[in-house]
Amino acid sequence: MILPLILVLYLLSTAAYRLWLHPLRNYPGPCWWAVWRVPYLKGTIRGTIVRDIQRLHNQYGPVVRIAPDELSYITPEAAKPIYTSSPEFPKDPMHLPPFHNGAPGILAADYAHHRRYRRLLASAFSEKGLRAQQGMIQSHIDRLMTRLQGNCSSGSLDMTVWFNWATFDIIGDLAFGEPFGCLERMETNPWIASIQGNVKSIPILNALRRYRLDRLIEFLAPPRLLEMRRRNAQFTAEKVDRRLKHATTTRGDLWDSVLADPPDGEPPMSRAEMVSNASAIVLAGSETSATTLSGCLWLLLTNPEYLQQLTERIRARFSTATVIDAQTVTQIQGLQAVLDESLRLYPAVPMQSNRIVPPPGARLAGSWVPGGTSVAVQQFAACRSPTNFHRPDEFIPERWEKEGEFINDRREASQPFSIGPRNCIGRQLALAEMRLILVHLLWHFDIELDRRRMENMDWMAVQGIWILWDKKPLWVVLKNRST
């Protein structure tokens, strides 16, 4: 009888403290979320947390207390100190993926390791490095177009799969000097499935870690997701070991610079660090680009006036596909606005990484936040907020022209590649890849949505989010262009 009473008193006293005495007590938000992290973890595991937080911001405003020790923001004023301060706000370890080999990759590393990784990888992702890769990227896009031409007459195609195949082959060539053969064999490499399963397992594993149930992971986590996680680690390690056997050979991949003499004073990457970074780069360099292309295509297909306008501009600009390259596509009027608007409505990574406010605290968006608080700017909620964008839920690329009724849009709220020293190192590669694939697709084909197979589905609205989007099939009818 005594133990249950003690438990009840503990729960009541904890709730009372967090509601009325905690340093974050004055921040708005639902009481249940402020008292326990259970609603947050429930949404995370179910894949609804991004939209849950959006609803909370719509109800409570630009800053919301979404857990006992966590604040969510949607304003650009909060983003700058959170992601660009020096010294930096460190990443929240409870929001990071567990390291399967003890070595964090570039996405999860602390300040010192991240800085070293970035310097070692810098040349591969520099403008010079990307120019050297243009021929390789173009060869995969050519193969994508050839495969689509050979298969489009048999019925509609799921473009989410085709985009994944193309971007996975490209990042495979860049990361390891050889493609994964998805387009060649027209089948999904097992690594793609393992990557997607691994990402989906992270929220569950983090929830167990938060309550110190790590040792029970084998019993509590879904076996299929654990197997995906194990296979992802195995595939990555095998690829890195295969590359290390040819460490002295120049293969035109990103490891050329990593395996060469490191910059002055920088220790070389260990094998474990190479494995962790390879896993991060393959994920970030394939899944995110494929996601953006899928979202962009959906938005164009459901807003046909913009699809027609962009298609006409592309075909007027290029008389033949052979003159389409990374430089000429940047000259197409409205192309970047279409991508920017797609990234606003459908950011490939809907949630920014959480940071910990260092002691004693910091002023964020005009209010004091105590040290130790976990904070983040939520991309999806920020980009869909009427406080940042006029007509926020509509696909209107001309808002990026910064005039007319959209002149007061807070475009800096949309940061799909993040900001600060930890912004996406592959931003230029991703943009070049997406521009080229989209332009080639609209140059070669007349496209329309297969509404029968889509069954009037709101493709974006039905997707769950486990760090990344759980994309559903996007059935598209492709016809070789008539003129």
Swiss-Prot record:
Record flagged with keyword Metal-binding: yes
Name this polypeptide is given: Cytochrome P450 monooxygenase stcF
Cofactors: heme
Function according to Swiss-Prot or TrEMBL: Cytochrome P450 monooxygenase; part of the gene cluster that mediates the biosynthesis of sterigmatocystin (ST), a polyketide-derived furanocoumarin which is part of the most toxic and carcinogenic compounds among the known mycotoxins. The first step in the biosynthesis of sterigmatocystin is the production of hexanoate by the fatty acid synthase (FAS) units stcJ and stcK. The polyketide backbone is assembled by the non-reducing polyketide synthase stcA by condensation of the starter hexanoyl-CoA and 7 malonyl-CoA extender units followed by cyclization and release of norsolorinic acid.
Family: Belongs to the cytochrome P450 family.
SUPFAM superfamilies, alphabetized: Cytochrome P450
Domain of life: Eukaryota
GO MF term set: heme binding; iron ion binding; monooxygenase activity; oxidoreductase activity, acting on paired donors, with incorporation or reduction of molecular oxygen
Disruption-associated phenotype: Impairs the production of sterigmatocystin and leads to the accumulation of averantin.
Pathways involved: Mycotoxin biosynthesis; sterigmatocystin biosynthesis
Binding-site residues for heme, renumbered to this chain: 424
One GO BP annotation of this record: sterigmatocystin biosynthetic process
Induction of expression: The genes forming the sterigmatocystin biosynthesis cluster are co-regulated and induced on oatmeal porridge or the fungal isolates were grown either on oatmeal porridge or in YEC medium (0.2% yeast extract, 5.0% corn steep liquor). Expression is positively regulated by the cluster-specific transcription factor aflR that binds the palindromic sequence 5'-TCG(N5)CGA-3'found in the promoter.
Keyword line: Heme, Iron, Metal-binding, Monooxygenase, Oxidoreductase, Virulence
E.C. no: 1.14.-.-
Disulfide bonds: none
Alphabetized CDD domains for the sequence: CYP60B-like
InterPro entries: Cyt_P450, Cyt_P450_CS, Cyt_P450_E_grp-I, Cyt_P450_sf, Cytochrome_P450_monoxygenase
Keyword Iron included in the entry's annotation: yes
